[in-house]
């Protein structure tokens, strides 16, 4: 696979022309260099995945998270996708250089696609106020995309409102020379995988749930895609992509008090995607793009021990954008206008949730709970206007400049709504209602203005390049004026690209969490007989930010080996957490958000790959080895994020010692050292491609909260929270993908692919409890993929 490498981005195959055109607006200091690499890796903080890269990688459920899984700057939550829940198809959370998974910026064609309503709440529990969210506003199918760029460090000044990184997905643009239709089908099922389940979890796993935690004992996944590229008139055309990803999961429909399964039912997990872009090359000076986008996700649940508790939870996002590029005599002007609607919802089949102390329902006798809690949702409409002006390069003596300036305005109309009245209560032995709560119908909103200005300059002198920049952000949600300096320098030591050094300092201010402002609106509709109230305080918060020091090295070894090393140090400041207290006089529970969270992260990666593939008997061989190490310490749980309530503790007991809380290693996303060997074999005459990844992960630790009944609990430290780490063994996994495009069917362009994930069927523990119950990663898994272009 051919790769074209520009400092700051890897470009691949047939996508080079468009990608280079896009990147010319950004960093392009030196001449291009060709490399061959099975898996894209960061170059000066940018990793570029083209459609060719996406087709090569085993992308599992087809989400952006699956695509980024092998990136050395990224860590996944290893407890999110396990042997217990392989039927789930939702995107997984990612942490970039140890930052909060809820502080990444997701973009589609440069416009924000981040869901900042309440991304830390991924609970599927049945509740009157629970609306599950996720930081990815659009659940994109990566097979429909032109390319994806991850900015993990040295992030350019035009990107903001993040702490971790930026993920920018590009929708395919019309190409008059490539009018094709593509059909695709991809599938797997529970019969095609090995599940490793702890004996203590087997009963709940076979039932399909434990309380509000859902498992996938029996499922079938079927993914369908259709895409096309069509010229409509001279210099005017359209691309479109449609997909449905569906997982049908069979779980217990009803479980009696004594654990008897009384019937099973099928529950659907569906993600629909529709993307389209109309392009008009009006002249040599003007190009227009009109982009339409939609994703809809829905998941069916019930609480198996509660009759009539069926509900649907999901996300719907849609929007449009108009983009105009204008080539002036002295500069290039880009103007973008967009609108995006992002929403999350929970819709129960019933509006009343009640408990009877004495009832009979099927096999249940005695106390039982049944029903639902109505329909509730929250959403945000973002109206975006942005513009950017890039001056042509000018020179004074040996020094050249290429400055650019930009501005952005986003109006966010965030709202929450209870669509119907619902209520909950308990019927006591006398047949009377107690603990009665009414959730009234209502709707409320808040409007937020977001302003951004930025400027930067590409300065080159001989074989040294500098890019200083500064970004200013303000919004009337937290009313903070945030100034972000960005600086990067690059030195081509011998002016021949054999030895290059990059270094820089950058600051990244995060985005807002809108649920803090919507929560009191939603809670105001709750009428409790007890008179209990809730109050949320967030108005005096600072905007969380990360300071970054980074360095990159690139060295050509001999004629054909490229070595790259990157080091990133991050300090996270003013991270949001919370504390709660109850005012007994007013019966008010007050939740107050604060800026007590902080972390420090050291991140290092090293890779070796070839400038040209090895040619042996008509077979191209592309080897690559990648080392990655990320270690964080701090007083913040990344999974809990802004809902973390422990950061006020100055000291805790950790592994038997009383220590400062912020000196304790971060427990989640804790996979420090990873080494992967990637090896591609391509036989052009037959159309066979065999891609392999062999990955080793060092032994890790699972964090356990100790209670007084645990043997490790130290009674003399009873005033402190106590934690202990349990060792999880190292792991070795092998993923492989075999693709065949028969050369005798060139006109049909048929491709058949098979993925085998975890070929060795390694049994890897990813978590354990304080009672010793382990959770394991998925075992060996088979996928089948068929596509045709015509």
Residues covered by each model-derived region:
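Periplasmic N-terminal accessory/gating domains of Gram-negative outer-membrane beta-barrel systems
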Residues: 22, 39-156, 166, 170-172, ...
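C-terminal beta-signal and adjacent terminal beta-strands/loops
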Residues: 116, 578, 687, 695-714, ...
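Surface-exposed extracellular loop regions of Gram-negative outer-membrane beta-barrel proteins
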Residues: 123, 298, 476, 494-545, ...
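Short loop/turn motifs that connect adjacent beta-strands in outer-membrane beta-barrel proteins
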Residues: 143, 157-159, 174-181, 231-236, ...
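Transmembrane beta-barrel wall of Gram-negative outer-membrane proteins
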Residues: 179-180, 213-298, 315-332, 626
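Transmembrane beta-barrel strands of outer-membrane/channel proteins
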Residues: 181-189, 240-244, 290-296, 335-341, ...
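Face-selective signature of the C-terminal outer-membrane beta-barrel domain
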Residues: 275-298, 311-478, 603-613, 617-628
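Gram-negative outer-membrane beta-barrel transporters
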Residues: 460-465, 567-576, 583-708
